[in-house]
Amino acid sequence: MTKHYKIIGLRILSWVITITGLIIFIGNVHEYGLHFTYNQVLAIIIVILLLVTTMYFSVTPKLLKWNEKYELVWWLCYLCAPIYLFLTNLYNSTDLGYTIKFWLFFGGGAALIIISKYILKNKK
C-alpha cells in the first residue's frame, strides 16, 4: 500500500472515531436529558468545526494542495489538543465513563491525525 493510501486510511479512521464518539455523546445526552453547560456547548462546536474543516481540506483538490503547503489542518489539531484536554476536566471529572466518552468524542479524531502526522514525518 502506498503512502498516499495510508494517509487517506488514517484520515478516514480519525473521522470514524470522532463521528462514533459524537453518536455516543448524543446518545448520553438523549438518555440523561438536554442539560448542556457552557463548556459542553463550546466543546461540541469546536469538534464539529474541526471535523468539517479536516474533511473539507482533505477532499477539495485546490485546498488539499494549499493545505499540504501550509499544513493548516495540522495546526488546527495542535491548537485544539490542549483545549479538549482542558474541557475534559471541566466536563465531568467525577465520572470516569463520561471522561472517556468525552475524550473519544472530542480528541479521538484530532489525536489520531496528530499521531499519524508525527509518524509520517519521522519516517522520512
Swiss-Prot record:
InterPro entries: DUF5504
Pfam families (UniProt xref): DUF5504
Key words of the record: Plasmid
Name listed for the protein in its UniProt record: Uncharacterized 14.5 kDa protein in laf 3'region
Lineage: Bacteria, Bacillati, Bacillota, Bacilli, Lactobacillales
